Amino acid sequence: MGFNKYAGTKTEKNLWEAFAGESQARNKYTYFASVAKKAGYEQIAALFLQTAENEKEHAKLWFKALGELGDTAENLLHAAEGENAEWTDMYERMAKDAEEEGFTDLAAQFRGVAAIEKMHEERYRALLHNVEAMGSLPFRPPAMQQNRS
């Protein structure tokens, strides 16, 4: 990952808060767009989607400022580590809490999502292995290689 010149400052905390807020807004607006479209409100859906794209770009600004965008290998490793934390810790902890509070259906959902996150981690690690094995050469499908004259 890149260098984070804000490490350990209030500004770093603010950047993470801004990134989280913009990321959450993007997802909410995407969900809202689906509801509006299903109800026949095409213009409202389009506005939600346009705003969601704006929020994505805002989030990217803060993510880049935090030094979190690396090269493909770094991004794959970062993604794999995040997925690992989700399936080994976060969702298991949440499932246990839900069970203790009597929300067994939700606990099962947490564990189901954890299983998917495990597959995500495995996929990212396999891709990382492939990228590292290729070195600095990007993958080009055979059809693209043949057309390079």
Regions found by a protein language model. Name each.
Residues M1-S149:
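Non-heme di-metal
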